[in-house]
Amino acid sequence: MNERVAELLQKKEKYTFTDLCTIMEILRGEGGCPWDREQTHASIRNNFIEETYEVIEAIDTEDPKLLREELGDVLLQVVFHARMEEEIGRFDIDDVANDICAKLIHRHPHIFSDVKADNTDQVLANWEAIKADEKARVTVSDKLNAIPSILPALMRAEKVGKKSGLDSADYAANPEEAIATLMMLTTQMAEADDAKRGQLYGEMLFAAVTLGRKLGLEAETALTAETDRRIADYMQMEQELGADPQKALTPEQLAAKWQTLREAYGE
């Protein structure tokens, strides 16, 4: 890479996406950064996962400054991986942009063609039909196998339940059925061996995910919010006691203190 280009980049007041690609080319090129040059898709795989979660956290905390920063980190990962592929001649970042542009145009025929879609449900139905046609997935099994196994378990369960129909119980209309199912599984777990207990616990979690989906709730979002509330509760108890609640209280006192705190919140 021309040293003059590197010098000019340092003097810019505002950078563009093209500049990001150029910087990555410099870092990966001859005489570039030793660390960047050594990386492979596999070696920075976890970085991509971590950066993605940090974007989600920025969204959840409604912090636009942090969101801007974290989106940049994710964009860096995209450019990094695309640059590796360009170096071996398989594709480059323009190919990536081309493919997603073509996909968006093809999957929005109600915008770029004459297909009618008067509401969100019709748009989503068209999207899934076009997606299935593109991927040549003609069976439900194909669609289920196409759901990435690396997804968070609760999110994956939602997708499998929605596509398979194996969670057809209408817990939203009959919440007592959900309660009965969970109680039955709890009873069976108490009597089962370790191997069976794990299976029953999985069924219980899937039933809980189904209940949420039927009510229009996302399991990941709901569990994250509840976990955050419990952290906040513990911090408040620690502040009120001036000590670690687990050391200052017996398990029974800790449970009672937490219940009192929840009741004060109207929970």
What are these regions (language model features)?
Residues 1-70, 76-267:
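Flexible "arm" and connector segments at domain edges
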